[in-house]
């Protein structure tokens, strides 16, 4: 590029010294054209005389203008681009003042005559036409930036993005010409949208539907977005949205038949209404959900290829579905068929997230999810965000729900371009949607549309908004719907007559009535019945691995490229893993996990692991991704495993629980063939993602038929580290346990961990699959009593319970059966090993799989001890926490109240653990002492000499 082009390019973005340099060259050219280089001379030759707005004005013989005026004009043009949104016509109700005075020429000490004298090309590369004046440019940019679309780009750092968007909009991308057929089709879409809502309103009086009315243009907007994304190569389009307008989007964007929606209003059977060709996938859970939470998975043929459209199931917890949808999309983009890390293909899938104007700035999960946009493990090649902005949140005005000008402002921190669009201009909405699809295809980055409309009725159809928002709703009642606004526009343009409008609307109403007539009159059966596979639970699975093969895997896991420098301390740790296969060797927790992953990959199952510090592991136990000490280059032996038939991906996550767990859940729901694991840094922090556990993971299948095999690793155990680094709050997951909705395990050996991971991988894709929560250890990671010999991996499988070796051998003498789980079992085992007293009066049983409760296995153990007088549950958590409240009634049921069931552990507390290490040690010692002490044996069923409940 020549010198003058560079100078001119700078003049567009800056004023002051750079522009002064241009003027200096120009004045030099005027005095002596030969004094500037040839290219610059040609450039100035093209200016000629500036065009005038009236034919009577006489053009001057050569360019002549005032430097100060050019500087002011440059500032004016830049300000229109940067701040035109403040003067834009983006509010359908006209209830926000337009700051049009910002661009009054007098504020810049300019007149129209001044602008006529300045060539537009001096101020912009994208002048409206050759030889245009600055006045024409000024008027053109006002049309572009202060019309029914407002654009915010000032916060973008990437100049290429800025310039591309500006060039597109200034060259007419938002002022597209629609053909007559396109305009009529657009009207038809608006009519379908509104008349659907009207039909529901009249037919199902008083039922909630969370109408789209006031934001009707969202439907053609989504139509155009979906079409644009498909044109860019997307084969999967995943949509997340809340309840507002959801039924309309289901009907018109996803193609859910009207009759199915009407059946849900009437509580009639609707399974037989699914199209016979199976193009619509609707999974029914056994307990179900309200109609405006349900999703849809539809395969369509568009542009001569099959495309999968998915609207994610959604709870009432606003915005949390966003990260779940991002997980869907990443799973659709990733190729997991080969060894190595999964290979991402951005163009294969795309996300559209529809937000509420109050929820977008109000819910922290939004920022968590936006933060993922450029992260290697979580990016999805550009998410399209749409704020369904009806300028109210239930009854709350914007000035009470956010501290910023726009609902979209939080997106600016992530350098996301923002388009504000007036929902009463459907053609502008469609034009923006097309431009956004092109942007996503080119830059693979997030982009946002703030679709500004209103809410025709209250928050729901039984709500009276005049009580809380009288001024707003007076304006809404007097405002025509976009269907009528656009129809009047088409009539004025001569595109459509009133009769043609009436015919279109009549056909739509007839279709709605015909669909209503298909709905059965009887109500559906309300019985809740679990599927047989869920009711029966997991079958017995052989998870052992042949010793020769396991040895081969171990050897390969200890190989890395020649010259790769492993940190010397880590080198010693890894070398010990080779010795574990020698006679008498033992395998620790981290080693067992790596072997499990290697064997699972060899079986052809992809593995994905993410969490805070998961490459190394919070406690330096994993080291599954190695870092060269000189170059920092990363290497994982699992990527080069010769027997691997699928991908292995591990990512250190951002410091977020909710969004990351939601992402991994979504990934697994979409890619049910993949073993997906999420690891909390400490189990204590998992409650930051409680919505994901409560609304999605524990209940998703019962509500929506949404299967998942997600594994959640929650470090848990009392080691004197205080109340925030001790408890994963096991009690919460057990409270949520029911209908075999997930597995809750607290393991005591490396081999058990190996086998339960392999069992989970084996069950992926089967009807019995369920999520799994593992209370993973901290101090046990390298504890000798938690290690396992090679034979435990090659000759055994997972055991729901494990009996303490060396105890309970004389069945006649056993009076006490001690049940415990996880670290408590190892603490007791350690004490048993050190004890010099006879412990033949007791036996210890480790409950490894707490839920589903291993009734048969525990009953078998109890039946072997005819003289047992009591069962004791021992835990390190307080009595109101941990497993006790879950375990007690189940143990009593197993014993049919024949034995006394009692508790040893910490008393009821409000905080889970002591902050004082000394106090912790004293409590831990007391628990162990009482568990192993003969002095507190129960005197018989229903009575106990044990001290009163330590309340």
UniProtKB/Swiss-Prot annotation:
Gene3D superfamilies (UniProt xref): 3.40.50.12470, 3.40.50.970, Multifunctional 2-oxoglutarate metabolism enzyme, C-terminal domain, TPP helical domain
GO CC field: cytosol; oxoglutarate dehydrogenase complex
Annotated catalysed reactions: N(6)-[(R)-lipoyl]-L-lysyl-[protein] + 2-oxoglutarate + H(+) = N(6)-[(R)-S(8)-succinyldihydrolipoyl]-L-lysyl-[protein] + CO2
Documented EC number(s): 1.2.4.2
Alphabetical keyword list: Glycolysis, Oxidoreductase, Thiamine pyrophosphate
Biological process according to GO: glycolytic process; tricarboxylic acid cycle
Cofactor dependence: thiamine diphosphate
Signal sequence, start to end: none
Stretches for region Disordered: 906-925
Molecular function GO terms recorded: oxoglutarate dehydrogenase (succinyl-transferring) activity; thiamine pyrophosphate binding
InterPro entries according to UniProt: 2-oxogl_dehyd_N, 2oxoglutarate_DH_E1, 2oxoglutarate_DH_E1_bac, DH_E1, KGD_C_sf, ODO-1/KGD_C, THDP-binding, Transketolase-like_Pyr-bd
Source species, domain of life: Bacteria
Complex and partners: Homodimer. Part of the 2-oxoglutarate dehydrogenase (OGDH) complex composed of E1 (2-oxoglutarate dehydrogenase), E2 (dihydrolipoamide succinyltransferase) and E3 (dihydrolipoamide dehydrogenase); the complex contains multiple copies of the three enzymatic components (E1, E2 and E3).
Known role: E1 component of the 2-oxoglutarate dehydrogenase (OGDH) complex which catalyzes the decarboxylation of 2-oxoglutarate, the first step in the conversion of 2-oxoglutarate to succinyl-CoA and CO(2).
Family to which this protein belongs: Belongs to the alpha-ketoglutarate dehydrogenase family.
Official protein name in the record: 2-oxoglutarate dehydrogenase E1 component
Species for this entry: Exiguobacterium sp. (strain ATCC BAA-1283 / AT1b)
């Amino acid at each position: 590029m020549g010198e003058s082009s560079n100078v001119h390019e700078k003049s567009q973005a800056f004023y002051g010294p750079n522009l002064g340099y241009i003027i200096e060259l120009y004045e030099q050219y005027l005095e002596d054209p030969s004094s500037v280089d040839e290219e610059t001379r040609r450039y100035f030759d093209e200016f000629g005389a500036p065009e005038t707005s009236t034919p009577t004005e006489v053009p001057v013989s050569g360019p002549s203008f005032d430097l100060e005026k050019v500087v002011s004009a440059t500032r004016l043009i830049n300000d229109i681009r940067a701040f035109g949104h403040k003067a834009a016509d983006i509010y359908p109700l006209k209830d926000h003042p337009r700051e049009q005075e910002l661009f009054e020429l007098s504020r810049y000490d300019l007149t129209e005559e001044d602008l006529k004298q300045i060539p537009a090309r001096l101020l912009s590369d994208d002048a409206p036409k050759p030889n245009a004046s600055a006045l024409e440019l000024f008027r053109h940019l006002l049309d572009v930036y202060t019309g029914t679309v407002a654009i915010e780009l000032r916060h973008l750092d990437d100049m290429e993005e800025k310039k591309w968007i500006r060039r597109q909009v200034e060259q007419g991308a938002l002022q597209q010409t629609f053909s007559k057929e396109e305009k009529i089709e657009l009207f038809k879409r608006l009519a379908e949208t509104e008349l659907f809502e009207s039909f529901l309103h009249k037919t199902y009086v008083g039922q909630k539907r969370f109408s789209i009315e006031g934001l009707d243009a969202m439907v053609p907007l989504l139509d155009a977005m979906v079409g644009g994304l498909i044109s860019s190569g997307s084969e999967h389009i995943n949509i997340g949205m809340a309840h507002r307008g959801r039924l309309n989007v289901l009907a018109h964007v996803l193609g859910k038949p009207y009759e199915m929606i009407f059946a849900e209003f009437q509580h009639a059977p609707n399974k037989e209404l699914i199209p016979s060709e199976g193009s619509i996938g609707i999974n029914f859970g056994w307990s179900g959900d309200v109609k405006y939470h349900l999703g849809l998975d539809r395969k369509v043929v568009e542009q001569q290829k099959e495309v999968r459209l998915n609207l994610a199931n959604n709870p009432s917890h606003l915005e949390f579905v966003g990260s779940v949808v991002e997980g869907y999309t990443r799973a659709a983009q990733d190729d997991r068929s080969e060894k190595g890390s999964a290979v991402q293909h951005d163009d294969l899938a795309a996300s559209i997230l529809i937000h509420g104007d109050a929820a977008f700035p109000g819910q922290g999960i939004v920022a968590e999810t936006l933060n993922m946009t450029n992260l290697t493990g979580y990016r999805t090649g550009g998410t399209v965000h749409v704020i369904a902005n009806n300028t109210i949140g239930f009854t709350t005005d914007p000035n009470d729900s956010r501290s910023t000008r726009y609902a979209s402002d939080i997106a600016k921190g992530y350098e996301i371009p923002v388009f504000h669009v007036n929902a009463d201009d459907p053609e502008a909405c469609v034009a923006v949607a097309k431009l956004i699809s092109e942007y996503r295809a080119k830059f693979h980055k997030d982009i946002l549309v703030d679709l500004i409309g209103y809410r025709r009725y209250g928050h729901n159809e039984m709500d009276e908004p005049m009580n809380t928002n009288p001024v707003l709703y007076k304006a809404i009642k007097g405002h025509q719907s976009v269907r009528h606004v656009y129809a009047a526009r088409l009539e004025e343009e001569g595109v459509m007559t009133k009769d043609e409008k009436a015919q279109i609307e009549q056909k739509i109403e007839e279709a709605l009535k015909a669909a209503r007539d298909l709905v059965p009159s009887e109500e559906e059966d309300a019985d809740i019945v679990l599927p047989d596979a869920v009711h029966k639970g997991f079958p017995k699975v052989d998870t052992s691995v042949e010793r020769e093969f396991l040895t081969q895997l171990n050897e390969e896991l200890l190989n890395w490229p020649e010259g790769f420098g492993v940190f010397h301390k880590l080198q010693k740790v890894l070398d010990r893993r080779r010795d574990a296969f020698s006679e008498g060797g033992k395998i620790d927790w981290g080693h067992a996990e790596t072997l499990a992953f290697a064997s699972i990959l060899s079986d052809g199952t992809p593995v994905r692991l993410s969490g805070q510090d998961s490459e190394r592991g919070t406690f330096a136990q994993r080291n599954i991704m190695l870092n060269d000490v000189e170059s920092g280059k990363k290497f994982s032996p699992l990527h080069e495993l010769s027997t691997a038939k699928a991908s292995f991906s591990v990512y250190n996550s951002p410091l977020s629980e909710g969004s990351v767990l939601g992402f991994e859940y979504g990934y697994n729901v979409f890619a049910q063939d993949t073993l997906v694991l999420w690891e909390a840094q400490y189990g204590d922090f998992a409650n930051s993602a409680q919505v994901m556990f409560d609304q999605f993971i524990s209940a998703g299948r019962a509500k929506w038929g949404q299967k998942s095999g997600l594994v959640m690793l929650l470090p848990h155990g009392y080691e004197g580290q205080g109340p925030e680094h001790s408890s994963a709050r096991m009690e919460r997951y057990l409270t949520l346990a029911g209908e075999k909705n997930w597995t809750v395990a607290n393991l005591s050996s490396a081999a058990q961990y190996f086998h339960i991971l392999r069992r989970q991988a084996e069950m992926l894709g089967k009807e019995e699959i369920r999520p799994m929560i593992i209370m993973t250890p901290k101090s046990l990671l390298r504890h000798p009593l938690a290690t396992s010999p090679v034979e435990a991996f090659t000759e055994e499988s997972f055991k729901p319970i494990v009996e303490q070796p060396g105890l309970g051998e004389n069945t006649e003498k056993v009076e006490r059966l001690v049940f415990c789980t996880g670290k408590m079992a190892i603490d007791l085992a350690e004490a048993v090993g050190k004890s010099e007293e006879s412990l033949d009066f007791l036996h210890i049983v480790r409950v490894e799989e707490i839920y589903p409760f291993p009734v048969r296995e525990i009953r078998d153990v109890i039946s072997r001890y005819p003289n047992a007088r009591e069962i004791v549950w021992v835990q390190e958590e307080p009595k109101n926490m941990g497993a006790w409240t879950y375990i007690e009634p189940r143990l009593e049921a197993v014993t049919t109240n024949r034995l006394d069931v009692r508790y040893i552990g910490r008393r009821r507390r409000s905080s889970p653990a002591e902050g004082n290490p000394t106090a912790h040690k004293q409590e831990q010692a007391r628990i162990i002492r009482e568990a192993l002490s003969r002095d507190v044996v129960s005197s018989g069923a229903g009575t106990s000499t044990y001290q009163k409940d330590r309340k």
